[in-house]
A protein has these predicted regions:
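Residue-level recognition of single "structural anchor" positions
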Residues: 1-193
Length: 193
């Protein structure tokens, strides 16, 4: 049996670097918050999953509130059938676990632990993600997926020795190759799962 912590992290939708003529809404001045209360389409949901071996899944999921269908699309064939899901009390996780026929341990609101099941590891991951993202003073949402991959790479190789990290960096930086024009890159939309 494997235990997986599933959780979401919310970022404000950012058009940083977009010219005023191309903006779909007026810009937020001096870092003001999202205007709508609660989770809205002005926010981006990043889904995260972490198991006991520190295997990490971190991807842009959707704008606004996540659904069980989006979770199925993301985690299909990535989580084993005999896994136990440890999540918060969001309804999408309950429906997802039921649809995928997985054992589900729900941690109640205001709690972090129930018996031997907890969400401390994923909470720790989110605090380090938040610290890491704060260094950049805001990231355009269209590039957020790239930053999540970068964070995953750093998290995956942080425990290795420096010489192994350098070899891994060289290997991973030269494997993927894609041909993209600058014009296409500037005007692209965020890539959700």
């Amino acid at each position: 049996m494997f235990s997986h912590n599933l959780y979401k992290y919310i970022f404000a939708y950012s058009y940083k670097g977009t010219k005023p003529a191309n903006m779909p809404r007026p810009s937020r001045k001096r870092g003001k918050q999202v205007k709508k209360r609660g989770i809205s389409n002005e926010q981006v949901c990043v889904a995260t999953a972490l198991d006991r071996q520190r295997n990490l899944i971190i991807e842009l999921l959707c704008t606004g509130r996540m659904t069980s269908d989006e979770l199925k699309k993301l985690y299909n064939n990535r989580i084993g059938e005999d896994s136990i899901l440890c999540t918060d009390s969001h309804k999408s996780y309950m429906q997802f676990a039921e649809d995928m026929e997985l054992e589900h341990k729900r941690i109640k609101r205001g709690k972090h632990k129930e018996d031997i099941y907890h969400i401390q590891h994923i909470n720790s991951l989110h605090s380090s993600l938040k610290r890491w993202m704060n260094r950049f003073n805001g990231v355009a949402t269209k590039y957020l997926g790239n930053y999540m991959k970068w964070f995953k790479w750093i998290d995956t190789f942080s425990a290795e020795k420096e010489s192994i990290q350098i070899k891994s960096f060289m290997l991973h930086s030269h494997i993927p190759y894609s041909y993209t024009k600058i014009k296409e890159f500037k005007n692209r939309m965020p890539i959700f799962v």
